[in-house]
Amino acid sequence: MAVIRANVVPVPVPAADLWSAVTVETTSMTMHANADLPAPQGLYDPRFEHDACGVSFVANVKGVRSHDIVRFGIGALCNMEHRGATGAEADTGDGAGILIQVPDRFLRAVAGFELPTPGAYAVGIGFLPGDAGDAEKAQASIEAIAADEGLTVLGWRSVPVDPTCLGRSAVAVMPSFKQLFVTDPAGAQGIDLDRKLFVARKRIEHELPAEQRTYFPSLSSRTIVYKGMFTTPQLAAFYPDLADER
């Protein structure tokens, strides 16, 4: 399964928040009726028409895992480049991303430490401070919050990235990228583990001091989000993980 989004950021945001601000979705960019829309008919009503992010879904209806799903998802994303936006700097976009199932086989090969059975651990990419010292402090704060929520941090992985594809503005505010792996010593799995992680993630977003500000697009036992301040073609180029067929 893959869910692909090309985002629109509807309001100005501080530069330091841009990489996380691409989670913002517009819900009503069309304020006036479009005369070209069809008339109300059946369940359709033009009043419900709104401009927003472009979203595609790619899945295997038989539940077969395949890297083709990721590949087709990235292709669908690139076909929706018109749903994103750029300014005068054509190689800095306002955001794009992909949500996929946790690639357990791949993560076991690259994590560098032992992982529990699928569903018994969670993973997410953290957008940490670009300064190495502040990022280290943020990691310590995150581990403390996780422990306070009854969770155990299994470890961190530095996410490989290639910023050479990005525009100057995106590089100027680029955070550092770390994958966080978490489990519950009490044995919570799946949706039960995700509920505990939701609380921890919200605490991380609200409790860390400004210099340690960290954002997790996702933190889940079931799915993982790769996203950033991209034009749609830049996503796959920036994250080499997405090219790995495992």
Q: Which sequence ranges carry the predicted segments?
A:
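N-terminal segments that mediate ammonia production and transfer
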Residues: 2-246
